[in-house]
Curated annotation (Swiss-Prot):
Pathway(s) where this gene product acts: Nitrogen metabolism; nitric oxide reduction
Residues that bind ATP: 215-222, 278-287
Sigma-54 factor interaction domain segment(s): 187-416
Sorted UniProt keywords: ATP-binding, DNA-binding, Nucleotide-binding, Phosphoprotein, Transcription, Transcription regulation
SUPFAM superfamilies with a match to the protein in the record: GAF domain-like, Homeodomain-like, P-loop containing nucleoside triphosphate hydrolases
Pfam family name, one: Sigma54_activat
GO biological process, alphabetically ordered: phosphorelay signal transduction system
Name of the protein in its database record: Anaerobic nitric oxide reductase transcription regulator NorR
Organism for this UniProt entry: Escherichia coli O127:H6 (strain E2348/69 / EPEC)
InterPro entries listed in its UniProt record: AAA+_ATPase, GAF, GAF-like_dom_sf, Homeodomain-like_sf, NorR, P-loop_NTPase, Sigma_54_int, Sigma_54_int_dom_ATP-bd_1
Functional description taken from the UniProt entry: Required for the expression of anaerobic nitric oxide (NO) reductase, acts as a transcriptional activator for at least the norVW operon. Activation also requires sigma-54.
Length: 504
């Protein structure tokens, strides 16, 4: 089999049709999977010795949340080192990173695997992976044909990274040095709420504004603060953390502003406070709503005038600090109740950000679960940790009052329990491994079965034919979208459609 010009042109056209990078990446992967008739395909971005999934087709949804460190995945490390097409033999002893992650075939091992490293010049920027369940599935394609595919994918990814970099630099004030955009490695999630939050982070990071980050406990406010700092011109300087809720009143002022020798009992030497440590960098004040009114007044002065006084010292020190504050309280209500200063609130909330709770993030829960599964796999030295369909269904319908932190702990506990119930280094998480309160799952939909005067095979084919027709009509005859709607493999759908007479 060889690629025609029409096939390559179709791939290029699909890339141009996409609206935004994510849509283009998904169109690329879906089209490639259809053309190559493989069981699974993925586009990965390379960053800091790990591969980060950008788009997948034919793989479990939680793969998008996983981070594949090279030291834990020898096949991916081989792809990163190769510099050219890598074909893994069916009997390769190197474990496939997607074993157990192809829906409907969790118990089967991937047989055929091809890796295509993607380069921008001499720099590795990503990889394409193609997987199939048949050992000789990709033998019909020459290395030269696969290199053409890799070149198209590398061009799309390289352009996306360049645009991302240029957009970031355009938001810089004046002649500030270029900086990196918000790293997708940290901010996991594709829900509308998280997409909007990432955009807002990218916007405010380029400025020097104070930011108030609000959100329920466990939503990841500290992660947002890190993302802002790392995407800002101050990223070369320290990000200093202080949990205001853990500060005893007797030492709070010293922690913030420092003290001089002899300022109080136990002050045996001069000591810098958090503001001095964060000079020219960023200070993250977590749980800002827990500060006393007296300390709030002193904090306000620093924000207004940019100088501090160590405890026991009459001299003022100039500091250049950007303040990021976080709270799980409604500070407007705290102001009305007299527990928080209105002037400080307005100083801090120049650019407010709200982190959505996990229950409002849709399928992000599955992506995050995949991320934590991969963390557990590496930490415990397991060959794989995968979620069963029942576990995924449970996670999607649980309310998670403790948000992402609760999910993380639940995954870690479930892995330990599942590992104890089976031998070997492979763990499959089932619903019973999660100790959630009773969760009401929606009843399965049962379709009405019409009375037909056909044998079983004819009735089955008639049902399949009509189902595919309806799905195609609803998806404007887009086969990839139709396959996603029917939750089946697009290559298998094409083969079935041909057998049913729906395609030539």
């Amino acid at each position: 089999m060889s690629f025609s010009v029409d096939v390559l042109a179709n791939i290029a056209i699909e890339l141009q049709r996409g609206i935004g990078h994510q849509d283009r990446f998904q169109r690329l992967i879906t089209t490639l999977r259809q053309v190559l008739e493989c069981d699974a395909s993925a586009l990965l971005r390379y960053d800091s010795r790990q591969f980060i999934p950008l788009a997948i087709d034919g793989l479990a949804k939680d793969v998008l949340g996983r981070r594949f460190a090279l030291e834990g995945h020898p096949r991916l490390e081989a792809i990163a080192r190769a510099g050219d097409v890598v074909r893994f033999p069916a009997d390769s002893e190197l474990p496939d990173p997607y074993d157990g992650l192809i829906p409907g075939q969790e118990s089967l091992k991937v047989h055929a695997c091809v890796g295509l490293p993607l380069f921008a010049g001499q720099n590795l920027i990503g990889a394409l992976t193609l997987d199939g369940m048949q050992p000789d599935q990709f033998d019909v394609f020459s290395d030269e044909e696969l290199r053409l595919i890799a070149a198209l994918a590398a061009g799309a990814l390289s352009n996306a990274l360049l645009i991302e970099q240029l957009e970031s630099q355009n938001m810089l004030p004046g002649d500030a040095a270029p900086f990196e955009a918000v790293k997708q490695t940290q901010m996991i999630g594709l829900s509308p709420g998280m997409t909007q939050l990432k955009k807002e982070i990218e916007i405010v990071a380029a400025s020097d504004l104070n930011v108030l980050i609000s959100g329920e406990t466990g939503t990841g406010k500290e992660l947002v603060a890190k993302a802002i700092h790392e995407a800002s011109p101050r990223a070369v300087n320290p990000l200093v953390y202080l949990n205001c809720a853990a500060l005893p009143e007797s030492v709070a002022e010293s922690e913030l502003f420092g003290h001089v020798k002899g300022a109080f009992t136990g002050a045996i030497s001069n000591r810098s406070g958090k503001f001095e440590m964060a000079d020219n960098g960023t200070l993250f004040l977590d749980e800002i709503g827990e500060l006393s009114l007296a300390l709030q007044a002193k904090l306000l002065r620093v924000l207004q005038y940019g100088d501090i006084q160590r405890v026991g010292d009459d001299r003022s020190l100039r500091v250049d600090v950007r303040v990021l504050a976080a709270t799980n309280r409604d500070l407007r209500e705290e102001v009305l109740a007299g527990r928080f200063r209105a002037d400080l609130f307005h100083r801090l909330s120049v650019f407010p950000l709200s982190v959505p709770p996990l229950r409002e993030r849709g399928d992000d829960v599955i992506l995050l679960a995949g991320y934590f599964c991969e963390q557990c796999r590496l930490r415990l030295g397991l060959s794989r940790v995968v979620l069963s369909a029942g576990a995924r269904n449970l996670l999607q319908h649980y309310n998670f009052p403790g948000n992402v932190r609760e999910l993380e702990h639940a995954i870690h506990r479930a892995v330990v329990l599942a590992r104890a119930t089976r031998s070997g280094d492979e763990v499959i998480l089932e619903a019973q491994h999660f100790a959630f309160p009773e969760v009401t799952l929606p009843p399965p939909e049962v379709a009405a079965v019409p009375v037909v005067k056909q044998n079983l095979r004819e009735a089955t084919e008639a049902f399949q034919r009509e189902t595919i027709r309806q799905a195609l009509a609803q998806n404007h005859h887009n086969w990839a979208a139709c396959a996603r709607m029917l939750e089946t493999d697009v290559a298998n759908l094409h083969r079935l459609a041909k057998r049913l007479g729906l395609k030539d």
